[in-house]
Amino acid sequence: TWGVDFALLDKDGQLIENPVHYRDERTLGMVEKSFEKISKNEFYSITGNQFMEINTVFQLLALKEKRSHLLERADVMLLMPDLFNYLLTGKMVTENSIASTTQLFDAKERTWSDKVINALGLPRKIFTKIVSSGTIIGDISEKICDELKIEKCKVIAVAGHDTQSALVSVPTTEKDFVFLSCGTWSLLGTEIDEPIINEKSSKYNITNEGGYENKASFLKNIIGLWLIQESKRQWEREGKEYNFSTLEELAREAKPFKCFIDPDDPIFVQAGDIPSRIREYCLKTNQEIPENCGEIVRCINESLAMKYRYSLEEIKDCTNKNYDVIYMVGGGTQSKLLCQMTANACNIKVSAGPIEATVYGNIAIQLMKTNKIENLYKAREIIRNSNDMSYYEPQNYELWDKEYE
């Protein structure tokens, strides 16, 4: 699943309440609140995580501050993928990659950080044993087998964070590469053997996540196609029905470089009238105001492409490496306009696909664990040969570079 969200269970293994999604205002101010208990530098040096109000740690801190009775009743916290594994098997464990999204995980020791947990006054007992991606958790319960009239089978903890399963499917042959997992969120980064946690990565607020085979991902979380998805929902509420293809065509026809937004501005996090918020942002920053759907979508796409360049430059500065290709995976690869704009803005070739990267990665981990595929290199080769990839070469870089400056 997506990262950071969780459920609390009581001593009988029952949900205390339904999980609450991270797009909720209860965590406002919790990042600053945490710095009263543990310094920002120490916090980052342990977890190596990008500070974002949505992170699990700040959700738990909000519960402690505002609804402490829930934490007092809780016996176990399970992140969303682990909750499904528990419902299937009855076993309570936490998979490594999803644990690393919580900002409660020691990135170097690859376990829960008692220092962070204790500093923030959170109950240590609710955190379960951490297991690696690819661990066989157990069998599907007899109750489910009887209900569905199926034979027993193994449940394998894949990379529970969807980005990390998607990363398994990146169709590369290189050790050093840049990926862009593009969906509701855009996650741009590189795969490394050990976390990068230093003054520079802290300044850039870059995150380290655990991945398959104990690899680490060094990446930036960027608000992604949420901006278009939520704009589309707003237009539907206004009686304007557009599919994504139509919106892309309207964007192609719109005036280029009319205005830019920072996709990560807090104004765009919550659900609602994103087009109005974009106009408000442009007004406040003394830019031209986008006046129709095409101009809004063009503004979003151009702004995302520029943000990808900005983040790529930060990644390169921290790794001291250059990259020849951006491997773009996920639903966003269906947008030819965004793929081309990404190549243009970053002045780098884009390889687009597979679309269903998370699914491919999920299946590949299970096949590797059951010895049907030899290793990660072979898995990526199979996925590459099973998909029609699209490639985009940079165009008009001088124009994009001028606008970027």
Stretches found by the model and what they are:
Residues 1-21, 50-54, 85-106, 129-132:
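Short beta-strand-loop/turn "lid" adjacent to the catalytic site in phosphate-handling enzymes
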Residues 1-4, 133-134, 182-185, 325-333:
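Glycine-rich beta-strand-to-loop/alpha-helix junction loops that act as flexible
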Residues 7-12, 32-34, 192:
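Short, conserved acidic/polar surface loops in the N-terminal third of protein domains
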Residues 14, 125, 321:
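Structured loop/turn residues at beta-strand edges in well-structured enzyme cores
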Residues 24:
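Carbohydrate-associated surface elements
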Residues 28, 35-48, 52-53, 58-91, ...:
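Active-site core segments that coordinate phosphate-bearing ligands/cofactors
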Residues 120-135, 363:
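A conserved helix-loop-beta module that forms one wall/lid of the active-site cleft
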